[in-house]
Amino acid sequence: MSEKEAVILKVENLSIHYGAIHALKGISFEIKSGEIVTLIGANGAGKTTSLNGIMNVIKKSGGKVFFNNIDITNIETHEIVKLGVALVPEGRHVFPNLTVLENLKLGSYSRKDKEKIKEDLDWVLKLFPRLGERLKQLGGTLSGGEQQMLAVARGLMCRPKLLMLDEPSLGLAPLLVKEVLETIMKIRQEGVTILLIEQNAFGALKIADYGYVLETGKIVLKGYANELLVNDDVRKTYLGVTT
């Protein structure tokens, strides 16, 4: 098996409860190195919970998570980051009273390789040239689209092998949504594997290699993204297409 075909993330029977609510009901999926994989589903389907479970932000009720064949099920979140997994949470979460540059540097807090950090700063500023024009500007004064770019760029500053993005296009104008999705494809071209959560199912499936459909904590459908785009159930439920 080539490096590109190797499974980088494997989730086995992941279950999560919020009190009496069974939010994830034993889901299993995997991502191969170099892929863009998307989880689509309605609000409350379990998409964000899946990411938080992988990162051990919330307690699991059952199941296993493997990253590069390492069992990370019970590893602390900051240790998972050091292994090469980054999560950009929904809602951007930039530090409003820090400059763009300070926000970016926080993304590399766990790294010691100063020369490589400088190289990666140059790299993310090539990906997001608008941020390079605003390095001294406070994060809170950026537009919504610019804050989203900053959140993604900060996630890249830890040089992840796997980047997990939770609703990166949420609340953005259509032109900015297109720009965000194009940037995600560029990031993949740089060798970063991506797990993408999106309510914009059409946009996500257009750029993804493979997709999983979540409903009420269960994976009800999976397949190559181009196949899901023409699936009648997906088209009616998530793409707004009537047949």
Predicted regions span which residues?
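Glycine-rich phosphate-binding loops of nucleotide-dependent enzymes
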Residues: 2-243
